Amino acid sequence: MHRSHPSISRRKHLMKEMMEDDYALPTETQQIARVISSRGNNLHEVETVDETFLVSMPNKFRKSMWVKRGDFLLVEPIEEGDKVKAEICKILTPEHIKEYTKAAIWPDKFTKKPVQEEATSQNKDDSDFEDDLLPNTNRPVNRDSSDEEEDEETSSEED
């Protein structure tokens, strides 16, 4: 008889739980938070609408679910912590965000800017960034086509 590794079955059950989620709305005590950074030891710095604090990853998520900067979480406050003020209840997926937005409980602070605004601000940033770049000394400098035409004219005059 073949037995699967315990962490594999735990991960499988967590993934199944996430997929079969009913997208229940947060309770009164739960908050929506965005991950700012990972602090190690299953601690993550998050921001909510009002404040920034640390949250802990519960044992059931450890080594099977990962969060990265910018991910959204549902957190529940814990009483025993000074620095660590909450524990992760749920890692929110784009489907959760869509449902929470429909229910009008998604914080305005976390609403994305319209695509057009992002593109124009990004283009401004890109052009500023390119202006600050030093020339690449590993490649020959491209000459303008107008310089080449002048060279051709001078060479034909010499003949």
From Swiss-Prot:
Gene3D superfamilies: Nucleic acid-binding proteins (2.40.50.140). Pfam families: eIF-1a. The keyword RNA-binding applies. GO terms for cellular component: nucleus. The keyword RNA-binding applies. Residues 109-159 are annotated as: Disordered. Keywords: RNA-binding. Residues 146-159 have a biased composition (Acidic residues). One of its GO terms (molecular function) is translation initiation factor activity. Residues 18-93 form the S1-like domain. SUPFAM superfamilies: Nucleic acid-binding proteins. SMART domains: eIF1a (SM00652). It comes from the Eukaryota. Belongs to the EIF1AD family. PANTHER family: RNA-BINDING PROTEIN EIF1AD-RELATED, TRANSLATION INITIATION FACTOR-RELATED. This is Probable RNA-binding protein EIF1AD. It comes from Drosophila melanogaster (Fruit fly).
